[in-house]
């Protein structure tokens, strides 16, 4: 006994399972999205549904490296699952969108948000994580409204394992498809072509501690200095849609590259990565640029240790990673190198 994974072919050959999947289509992108309907269990970290008959669907509901789902198929997980599922809190008649438990903007935008566009219902209750920001909730409301979908209420998930009855969960789409959808659906048409510097002065990590040394250089080149923390997501879309050049320290807000026009120049000031587990972070924004035809440039900055780590990071990120990785430090930029970089 255990959790049984069904691939796409298995689903198609199992009439009972296949009837539990709806398929919605966005003609503009030739994209399909399967939506599981019925009863299922999941946790609010992985959003990996398991049916009451112990079936799972890795091909459809994985959004991380597939190796990160291996624990679902162990005897230990199955034993705990069988023991605890009768105590799981039950929700009814929901669409499970989910959001990042750490409220990571990159993950919310590139993994969760595009799935909204495939929701077929016109009146919904929507499940998201309680840690989602008001800014994200407002954006979700706006997207639903623009699609003619009435949001009756949000249902907030904590860090827990839940049972959902008579509910739906849309599949997770490839990053390539998500980027295409976000760019075509949300990008604004702006005639202005602006030069933008994104400050992280109010962020917890990767603040440029000698940023004041760089401001004169930006001002002499007519850059706008913008703190995205103060802007709604709709306003952030405006900023990136109108940008000719973007300079920024590494930030989840660079996920907004998906709203840029082809040919936009993106300059990323990066921490010095040292470990294999950082490879995804290292190439994250250069990959987005390659998908969109943007021109990508990067330079490294020196790490400056931070004394106080915020509670959200301590909760969701391994302590060794926090201590080792320069991703969780501030940045010191050598001015002469920086001037050569942006010139």
Each model region followed by its residue ranges:
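The feature primarily captures lumenal catalytic ectodomains
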Residues: 1-343
């Amino acid at each position: 006994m255990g959790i049984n994974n069904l691939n796409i072919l298995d689903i198609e050959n199992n009439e009972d399972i296949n009837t539990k999947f709806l398929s919605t289509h966005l003609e503009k992108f030739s994209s399909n999205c399967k939506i599981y309907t019925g009863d299922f269990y999941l946790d609010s970290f992985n959003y990996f549904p398991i049916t009451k008959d112990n079936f799972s669907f890795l091909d459809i509901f994985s959004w991380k490296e597939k190796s990160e789902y291996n624990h679902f198929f162990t005897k230990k997980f199955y034993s705990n699952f069988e023991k605890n599922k009768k105590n799981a809190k039950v929700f009814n008649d929901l669409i499970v969108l989910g959001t990042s438990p750490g409220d990571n903007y990159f993950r919310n935008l590139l993994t969760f948000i595009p799935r909204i566009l495939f929701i077929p219902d016109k009146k919904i209750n929507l499940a998201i994580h309680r840690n989602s920001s008001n800014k994200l909730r407002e954006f979700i409301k706006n997207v639903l409204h623009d699609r003619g979908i009435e949001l009756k209420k949000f249902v907030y998930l904590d860090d827990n394992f839940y049972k959902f009855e008579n509910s739906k969960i849309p599949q997770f789409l490839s990053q390539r498809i998500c980027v295409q959808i976000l760019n075509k659906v949300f990008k604004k048409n702006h005639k202005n072509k602006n030069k933008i510097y994104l400050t992280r002065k109010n962020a917890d990590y990767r603040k440029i501690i000698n940023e004041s040394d760089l401001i004169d250089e930006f001002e002499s080149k007519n850059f706008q200095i913008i703190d995205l923390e103060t802007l709604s997501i709709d306003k952030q879309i405006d900023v990136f849609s109108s940008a000719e050049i973007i300079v920024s320290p590494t930030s989840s807000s660079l996920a907004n590259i998906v709203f840029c026009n082809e040919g936009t120049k993106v300059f990323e000031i990066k921490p010095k990565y040292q470990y294999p587990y950082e490879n995804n972070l290292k190439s994250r924004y250069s990959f987005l640029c390659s998908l969109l035809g943007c021109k990508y440039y990067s330079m490294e900055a020196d790490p400056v240790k931070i004394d106080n780590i915020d509670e959200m990071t301590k909760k969701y990120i391994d302590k060794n990673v926090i201590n080792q990785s320069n991703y969780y430090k501030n940045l010191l930029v050598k001015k002469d190198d920086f001037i050569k970089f942006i010139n």
